[in-house]
Amino acid sequence: FPDQDDFGRVFYLNARMSAAGIPQLAAIMGNCVAGGAYLPVMCDTLVMTEGSGLYLAGPALVKAAIGQDVSSEELGGATMHAEVSGTVDFKEPDDQHALARLRRLAAAYAPPELAPWAQARSETRPPRAKEQDLVGLLPVEGGTKPYDMRAVLARLLDASEFDEFKPEYGETLITGMGRLGGYAVGVVANQKLVIKRKGAIEIGGVIYAEAADKAARFVLDCNQAGVPIIFLHDVNGFMVGKQSEQDGIIRRGAKLVNAVSNSVVP
């Protein structure tokens, strides 16, 4: 609930800076508990190192409050938040990799004195992967052969470099940052491979609830950063069925539609 001078003020300032278009990048490199857990999550992008914890209450308090025995990793570890909750955007093995990730992310933001999409251009570097291989990767017209969209991106983006956003979450859509012709770009692409995760199989080329949620957040992040978006799509549609409806496919799909409709970057 609202307050003026207590901890809610910190939340308020966090949210207002975001609304003002001030980029906020956060890294969790240790335990982040209780009210403080909200602050990094309210930032535009969140990086978390393995071995860290993010939860409203730690294992000891959970045990005392509701009698539940749970490990720190199960409750709020980096892997759980990267693969299950989707709270973490990038999981890194240690502090050094987390800081390197933050530097790469910050480098993609548009300088404030330029128009949002007038990115500082770096030297164009050809893809390391052979562009000619695209012919063999993609199915012929009308074909249904699965293919790996990451392999396609490796043949399109500068130096075949791609910083993937939430790679372990909502895996039927691929989102992330790269460069094209020296300019920073965001990429939203569908994955055509069959995804096996959490004991379930997800069909490539179909948008599931988690994937829609991820893509919507990424489109918003690109607009916050002033980064143009490239869409690579070979999509059959949104997933249907009982589980999909219970997962909120309509609500979360609508979030994606809304985010793309209100996007102002090229």
List each language-model region with its residue ranges.
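Ligand-binding clefts of soluble mixed alpha/beta catalytic domains
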Residues: 1-266
